[in-house]
């Protein structure tokens, strides 16, 4: 039996892929599938344009500028600065390896929408994915110059874009009372209409194909010969393989295997506007406001902010309040929100995911650290883990995602 630990979008997709191949699977999480962590509250954007890792020489200046901006989108509590500095040092180092890291990340991201589309069709839920692209808008002075620069950057990466339609731009400009506007359309991107339903669909399909879905708070993994003991607060389950997919909580489970993992919890926030009519039927990224708005079933969801407050800090109420003010300024009906959410994204300093095997314990595998694009990469990751379990060579190669890169 294979224990998949963590029932977020990565773990549930992995369990689904393994079960569809006829393997005995145990999907374990302390919460119901998709109801905790970043999988519940993400923007729903299938971000196949994000071929480059975030760290870059130019981003180093932008990172600190955003950090010090009044009500800016990036926040690190003062008390966490000492603990955060080692991660930040590695982030800065990775900035000068961006080109090499793009070579590893881009082949994994580029086919991600097709892979997710195929997987959702295989489980009978193609309705969850909408392939209408997404829009990127600039509303401040210099909007046309910045849109043109972004189009050139995307062309170098072979990411297709087109100018946003004039009627859409006029609608967004009037809603925000802006004097200038420019925008791009990314036709190859997509979005899901309900991220939680995607996770539930993966978990339900796994269960329909024989997987057991159980609620346990896994505390540790112990090797016993060729078996793995999954130790929870209530019992111990013996399995042949374990796959760690616990997102921002993964480092602690892997520590006993000699892996010191520089994993941070970059918390994101969302608010929802129930019953709101979208400006268009596809997601919009407002670049100047660092705000994403996605049409979902029965509501609009808006996401923003990156808060390195750690796993245990309470949510910062200033962030949803600021997001609400931003949405009102952009012309959205954000006076009566459906509530706010905060969840931790698992982020490694080079912004590459961690996918592979524990070197000295090959029946312990891991798949986490997908930063902002876990939903995007869920199907690709599931396929890759299924290949690793079956001793098939994954395509594309994920050798660069091995955790030994941090040794």
Model-predicted segments: where are they?
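Glycine-rich FAD pyrophosphate-binding loop
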Residues: 20-40
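A conserved short coil-to-beta-strand element within the FAD-binding core of flavoproteins
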Residues: 166-173, 191, 214-228
């Amino acid at each position: 039996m294979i224990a998949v630990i963590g029932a977020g979008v990565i773990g549930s997709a992995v369990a689904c892929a393994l079960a569809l191949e006829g393997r005995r699977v145990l999907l374990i999480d302390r919460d119901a599938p998709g109801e905790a962590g970043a999988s519940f509250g993400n923007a729903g954007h299938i971000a196949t344009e994000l071929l480059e890792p975030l760290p870059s020489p130019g981003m180093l200046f932008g990172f600190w500028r955003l950090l010090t901006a009044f009500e800016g989108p990036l926040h690190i509590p003062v008390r966490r600065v000492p603990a955060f500095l080692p991660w930040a040092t590695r982030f800065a180092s990775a900035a000068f390896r961006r080109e090499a890291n793009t070579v590893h990340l881009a082949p994994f991201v580029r086919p991600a929408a097709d892979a997710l589309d195929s997987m959702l069709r295989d489980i009978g839920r193609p309705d969850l994915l909408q392939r209408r692209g997404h829009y990127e808008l600039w509303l401040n002075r210099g909007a046309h110059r910045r849109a043109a620069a972004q189009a050139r950057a995307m062309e170098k990466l072979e990411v297709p874009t087109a100018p946003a339609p004039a009627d859409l731009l006029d609608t967004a400009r009037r809603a925000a009372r802006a004097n200038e506007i420019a925008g791009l359309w990314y036709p190859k991107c997509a979005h899901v209409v309900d991220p939680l339903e995607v996770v539930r669909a993966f978990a339900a399909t796994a269960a329909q194909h024989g997987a057991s879905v159980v609620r346990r708070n896994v505390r540790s993994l112990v090797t016993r010969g060729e078996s793995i003991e999954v130790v929870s607060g209530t019992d111990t389950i013996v399995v042949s393989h374990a796959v760690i997919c616990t997102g921002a909580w993964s480092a602690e489970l892997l520590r006993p295997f000699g892996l010191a993992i520089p994993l941070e919890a970059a918390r994101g926030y969302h608010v929802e506007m129930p019953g709101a009519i979208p400006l268009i039927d596809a997601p919009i990224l407002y670049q100047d406001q660092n705000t994403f708005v996605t049409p979902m079933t029965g509501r609009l969801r808006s996401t923003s902010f990156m808060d390195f407050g750690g796993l245990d800090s309470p949510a910062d109420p200033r962030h949803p309040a600021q997001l609400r003010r931003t949405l009102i300024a952009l012309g959205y009906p954000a006076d009566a929100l459906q509530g706010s959410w905060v969840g931790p994204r698992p982020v490694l300093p080079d912004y590459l995911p961690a996918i592979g095997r524990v070197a000295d314990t090959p029946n312990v595998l891991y798949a986490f650290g997908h930063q902002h694009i876990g939903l995007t990469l869920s199907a690709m990751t599931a396929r890759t883990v299924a290949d690793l379990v079956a001793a098939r060579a994954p395509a594309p190669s994920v050798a660069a995602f091995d955790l030994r890169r941090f040794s």
